């Protein structure tokens, strides 16, 4: 079988790593595979890649969205060229992942998908496919996606725009994304499956396929990090994010650090250098790790992993930490709860005071 994966990145970021992993698994089974990507590719040695457009195409698409609010409808020439490559490759299965990110024209793409006769799988990693613009909405309490969007409360959030075209975009996406023959959906959590079942995508076959991690990477891993950062006698509370946007809970970590005794140390990974200087001194703020092996070392070192995110469609870092032997603490009513419960974690009520209570209970049990 010939597979074509389409994602904003290849081997980079959370979705890019998942696509790379899925591609390698099928190549190991003897299938022919390619990854088409828009913005970044790394760690894809041995995988044939199809770049969609150029960095300049992405920048122009992003600028168009900032001004007009029509993200997903730029990159016409780049997408037209890409679709000619798709026809030449002639895949048996087209596997869509994240289509937002200013790299592909969804009008041209779904015009092709509607008539190509191929088997199509679409793995949803967020809610963008059934909204007028945003990938997440529950943390701001928005239900406009149920009735067609418009009057958007998140124009200043990714994907940021000056013009509210969400009602128009919603209608265009609904027309494009529905009624595609041979298309099935996959989601990583019951939480996201429930939302999809209430959206205009509800008529497609839907499978629950939880994300997985590489056990060769994420397992208990010894290191000298404790000595390097003087954490030998501390109860380490770890948080990790690729981008510390508001929904990830950075403010809750700041409040949490003030509630913990000196015997605890909060360590946050993924903090930009400019932001590191602004955080309280009792937080050890570090940039992104050099590689996944170093990240596994941090997970292993930690006494507890905390994810105060208020909206996730899965929670990869929660799973990674658990696979390294560290107890996760998450907020209730997000997909992270599903991951934590499956690995003996704690699901706390929302608020730093509840996180502190759970952490101090674990510290007491550990006698540390």
Please place each PLM-identified region on the residue numbering.
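Acidic anion/phosphate-binding donor-loop and adjacent secondary structure
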Residues: 194-197, 213-228, 277
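Nucleotide-activated donor-binding/catalytic signature segment of Leloir-type glycosyltransferases, i.e.
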Residues: 273-293
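Short acidic/histidine- and often glycine-rich active-site loop of Leloir-type glycosyltransferases
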Residues: 277, 332-342, 346-347
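Short alpha-helical donor nucleotide-sugar binding micro-motif in glycosyltransferases
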Residues: 297-302
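Aromatic "clamp/platform" in nucleotide-sugar-dependent glycosyltransferases that forms part
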Residues: 310
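Conserved acidic donor-binding segment of nucleotide-sugar-dependent glycosyltransferases
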Residues: 342-353, 361-366
């Amino acid at each position: 079988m010939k597979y074509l994966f389409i994602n904003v990145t290849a081997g980079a970021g959370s979705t890019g790593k998942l696509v790379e992993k899925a591609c390698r698994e099928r190549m190991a089974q003897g299938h022919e595979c390619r990854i088409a990507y828009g913005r970044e590719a790394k760690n894809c040695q041995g995988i044939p890649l199809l770049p969609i457009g150029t960095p300049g195409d992405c920048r122009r698409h992003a600028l168009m969205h900032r001004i007009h609010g029509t993200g997903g409808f730029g990159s016409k020439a780049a997408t037209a060229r890409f679709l000619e490559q798709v026809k030449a490759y002639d895949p048996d299965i087209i596997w869509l992942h994240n289509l937002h990110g200013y790299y592909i024209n969804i009008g041209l793409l779904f015009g092709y998908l509607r008539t190509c006769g191929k088997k199509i799988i679409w793995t949803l990693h967020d809610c963008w496919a059934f909204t007028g613009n945003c990938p997440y909405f529950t943390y701001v309490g928005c239900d406009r996606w149920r009735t067609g969007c418009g009057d958007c409360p998140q124009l200043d959030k990714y994907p940021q725009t000056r013009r509210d075209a969400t009602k128009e975009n919603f209608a265009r996406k609904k027309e494009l994304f529905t009624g595609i023959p041979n298309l099935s959906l996959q989601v990583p959590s019951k939480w996201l499956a429930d939302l999809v079942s209430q959206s205009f995508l509800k008529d497609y076959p839907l499978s629950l396929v939880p994300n997985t991690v590489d056990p060769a990477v994420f397992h208990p891993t010894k290191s000298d990090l404790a000595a390097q950062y003087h954490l030998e006698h501390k109860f380490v509370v770890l948080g990790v994010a690729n981008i510390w946007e508001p929904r990830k809970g950075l403010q809750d970590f700041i409040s949490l650090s003030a509630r913990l005794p000196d015997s605890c140390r909060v360590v946050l990974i993924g903090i930009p250098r400019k932001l590191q200087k602004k955080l309280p001194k009792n937080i050890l703020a570090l940039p992104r790790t050099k590689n996944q092996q170093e990240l596994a070392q941090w997970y292993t070192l930690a006494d507890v992993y905390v994810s105060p995110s208020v909206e996730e469609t899965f929670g990869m870092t929660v799973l990674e930490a658990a696979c390294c032997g560290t107890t996760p603490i998450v907020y209730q009513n997000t997909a992270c709860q599903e991951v934590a419960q499956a690995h003996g974690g704690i699901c706390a009520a929302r608020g730093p005071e509840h996180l502190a209570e759970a952490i101090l209970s674990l510290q007491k049990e550990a006698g540390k």
